[in-house]
Amino acid sequence: MRRLLALLALASTAFAQPEPKVIKDVRYRGGDDLTGYEAERCKLDLTLPPPAAQPFATYVWFYGGGLKNGSKTLASEHCAEIAASFAREGIAVVVPDYRLSPKAKYPEYVDDAAAAFAWTVRHIGAHGGDPRKVFIGGHSAGGYLALMVGFDPSRLKPYGLGLKDVAGIAQVSGQVFTHYTIREERGQARYSVTSDEAAPAFHVRKTLPPILTLYSDHDMTGRAEENQFLIAMLKGAGHVETTSLKVTDTDHGSIGHNLRFAEDPGHKAIGQFIRQQAAAR
């Protein structure tokens, strides 16, 4: 019996899936002119899938927090768990920190998001990834950042990149009008509606990268409607690679945090979107 148990244990070890590799606190901004706050915040964690025969796709993921709060190490954001869950399926995940209001003002946090994406395109090949297959996304304020980087070509231009370098956008319940924190920085009301150069909706056009939008059936006030508006405007502009999913039995928080579970409908939708779009590039 002992010998049988030992053989079973050995067999289970042999067939066990290797765990993802995590590289922490990689600086994505450099130079001698960085402020102390930039040096503190402009770092990312890279979660790599087990070695594969083909270069893998990568998902740059921005957590939420209203552009005022959040950290890649904050337990309530579940960033490490989300990253590991996708990495086990063969998709690398990059989770950057970024500067926050009020220490930072618009467009500094958007520029940080663009810098993190650019770092990924330039460096993921050294880790086994395909730089042509770098996707971007996030939850809530993170979704807003992903949309701004993926919609406004001026954000990537300083890094010698363009929207063609964005393999796709998979965002979760992001703000599509000018973010309320930016409006507050300007002295405007939180629930006023503004769509200017700081709004993803301002940059809608036919030629944007492929887009997947997830939103909740019990989302925060106005957020589901904002995302539905974005979907409608993209389709109206002739953008043919627009897909969406209303994730039921979720609220504004759980729709993002549940992505750490492989069986979650949102997780499945994002994984399928990345695999399909990566195969097409």
Language model: regions and residue ranges:
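Short beta-strand element of the alpha/beta-hydrolase
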Residues: 55-66
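C-terminal catalytic histidine-bearing segment of alpha/beta-hydrolase fold enzymes
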Residues: 214, 221-224, 228, 235-281
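Primarily recognizes the serine-hydrolase "nucleophile elbow" in alpha/beta-hydrolase
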Residues: 115-185, 195-196
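Mobile cap/lid helix-loop segments that gate and shape the active-site cleft of serine hydrolases
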Residues: 19-21, 25-31, 166-203, 209
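Alpha/beta-hydrolase
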Residues: 62, 172, 247-250
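Short amphipathic alpha-helix adjacent to the substrate-entry channel of hydrolases
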Residues: 73-94
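N-terminal cap/lid segment of alpha/beta-hydrolase-fold proteins
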Residues: 17-54
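Serine-hydrolase catalytic-loop signature spanning alpha/beta hydrolases and amidase-signature enzymes
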Residues: 66-69, 73-74, 93, 119
